[in-house]
UniProtKB/Swiss-Prot annotation:
PANTHER family named among the record's database cross-references: SOLUTE CARRIER FAMILY 35 MEMBER F5, SOLUTE CARRIER FAMILY 35, MEMBER F5
Known function: Putative solute transporter.
Phosphoserine modifications at: 207
Family assignment from sequence similarity: Belongs to the SLC35F solute transporter family.
A GO cellular-component term linked to this record: membrane
TM annotation in the entry: 69-89, 101-121, 244-264, 269-289, 297-317, 328-348, 362-382, 396-416, 421-441, 453-473
Domain EamA: 253-317
Keywords: Membrane, Phosphoprotein, Transmembrane, Transmembrane helix, Transport
Subcellular location: Membrane
Protein's name in the database: Solute carrier family 35 member F5
Length: 524
């Protein structure tokens, strides 16, 4: 009996193996080892898992958007509580130390504390010491577009090259030569059980798919690591953040200075109500300079803002005659601050579309630095013009300013900007309306202020306009007012339906004979 030959080369017809029937651990098919096939299959399964996860992430984007909206609303509610407490503390400070410019300058300069992140936070130091964006950005330049395509594109076009057919030379393989030396005594060839093609088809991927070929050789954890690197690379550098902070430093300072001037002239409740008019300016600016779908202009949003403005007018009319002059000046400062706040949030959201691209603490840190370096000459200007005499506060007032600056400015502004990124610029500005009931309660309890019925009549529509706009943005810019207007217009201007008369059937002709079609169906 002739022993079965040891077959370790290519799968030539007639070759047998000494391994068990299912022991394919070292088998070779058409010049490809089974280990290579198994490794390629495992890699392909890993990449398929990546594609499936990307599809799942794209399908769950609606759920994540709702979570972002809910988190943003909670953050804005917390900011409202902090702002009301900060406003009451500021109002108390102004009774003993009425220096709005000094208070604003001191609070804004405290943003410099965020720059301590360059000492504590290692990624910030890497951006300055090693040029963090250099090598990874060049190495994974095309990968960002690849991951974006995985989540947005629904079909991958197979743009392979034209097929090239090359004959397979089984006898030229080194394994075949080794086989011929070991089993040269065999003279009777066995009947072929597996027939292989003598021609192999070769297709080449285009250069645009080179990244996919590279990723197919990477494990799933490695792909996830590179994806996290891409997110880090997508962040703005320290230089870019500093440039943005330099521009918004002046706008932010003017907005806060206007708010502080208003607090020094009138009650906290009136200031907060008038400051909520920033929703009108935000709606107009966001319609002109939209940053996302949540900033789209709708008729329902316009009516909600008009409702808020109507309430503001009633609140302004509720002021007493004794303090009418100061209330008017405070109202003007409040409206100016509302306008600057709208410019600030709309422009920064247009400049930075996602919150993960901007390091918010770094942004505010540079804002405080530029404020400290560039705006100190304002003390001399206001002192010599007589608008605000420079005077250093006492220890109690200084302690109140420091506490108010750390919590009411440094922390609250960070949370507010984060909440605006999670929701929309309009919701972020209209969130100021929620300070109305809290400030009313605080003024009535702490300062014993009595408000007229006009004040409450105006506070209610301003308060509810925030919830109206939130619902409209939550339901994908739902515009019920426009829908109602269209239905009313269609009801009024509807046309009578054209009724067919018997003579119309004579003028109708079927292009396809229904009788012939039915006969063909019956025949089949």
């Amino acid at each position: 009996m002739v022993p079965p030959r040891l077959h370790r080369g290519a799968g030539r017809p007639g070759g047998l193996s000494s391994l068990p029937p299912f022991g394919l651990g070292s088998a070779r098919f058409a010049g490809i080892a089974f280990e290579d096939l198994r490794e390629a299959l495992a890699t392909r399964l890993q990449m398929v898992y990546v594609f499936i996860m990307n599809r799942v992430n794209s399908q769950s984007s609606g759920f994540s958007q709702r979570r972002r909206m809910a988190l943003g609303i909670v953050i804005l509610l917390l900011v409202d509580v902090i702002w009301v407490a900060s406003s009451e503390l500021t109002s108390y400070v102004f009774t003993q130390y009425n220096k709005p410019f000094f208070s604003t300058f001191a609070k804004t300069s405290m943003f410099v504390l965020y720059l301590l992140g360059f000492i504590i936070w290692k990624p910030w130091r890497q951006q300055c010491t090693r040029g963090f964006r250099g090598k990874p950005a060049a190495f994974f330049a095309d990968a960002e577009g690849y991951f974006a395509a995985c989540t947005t594109d629904t079909s991958m076009s197979s743009s392979l090259s034209e097929p090239l057919y090359v004959p397979v030379k089984f006898h030229d393989l080194p394994s075949e030569k080794l086989e011929s030396t070991n089993i040269g005594t065999e003279k009777t060839p066995k009947k072929s059980r597996v027939r292989f093609s003598n021609i192999m088809e070769i297709r080449q991927l285009p250069s645009s798919h080179a990244l996919e070929a590279k990723l197919s050789r990477m494990s799933y954890p490695t792909v996830k690591d590179q994806e996290s690197i891409l997110k880090t690379v997508g962040k703005l550098t320290a230089t870019q953040v500093a440039k943005i902070s330099f521009f918004f430093c002046f706008v932010w300072f003017l907005a806060n200075l206007s708010y502080q001037e208003a607090l020094s002239d009138t009650q906290v409740a009136i200031v907060n109500i008038l400051s909520s008019t920033s929703g009108l300016f935000t709606l107009i600016l966001a319609a002109v300079f939209p940053s996302n779908s949540g900033d789209r202009f709708t008729l329902s949003k316009l009516l909600a803002v008009i409702l808020s403005i109507g309430g503001v007018v009633l609140v302004n009319l509720s002021g007493s005659e004794k303090s009418a002059g100061r209330d008017t000046i405070g109202s003007i400062w409040s409206l100016a601050g509302a306008m600057f706040y709208a410019v600030y949030i709309v422009m920064i959201k247009r400049k930075v579309d996602r919150e993960d691209k901007l390091d918010i603490p770094m942004f505010f840190g540079f804002v405080g630095l530029f404020n400290l370096l560039l705006l100190w000459p304002g003390f001399f200007l206001l002192h010599y013009t007589g608008f605000e005499d420079f005077e250093f506060p006492n220890k109690v007032v200084l302690l109140c300013i420091i506490i108010n600056g750390l919590i009411g400015t440094v922390l609250s502004e960070f949370l507010w900007l984060w909440g605006c990124f999670l929701t929309s610029s309009l919701i972020g500005t209209l969130a100021l309306s929620l300070t109305i009931p809290l400030s009313i309660i605080a003024d009535m309890c702490m300062q014993k202020v009595q408000f007229s019925w006009l004040f409450f009549a105006g506070a209610i529509p301003v308060f509810f306009s925030f919830f109206i706009v939130t619902l409209l943005c939550h339901y994908n810019n739902w515009d019920p007012v426009m829908v109602g207007v269209r239905r009313v217009f269609a009801f009024i201007c509807r046309k009578h339906r054209i009724q067919r008369v018997p003579e119309d059937s004579e003028q109708c002709e079927s292009l396809i004979s229904m009788h012939s079609v039915s006969q063909e169906d019956g025949a089949t």
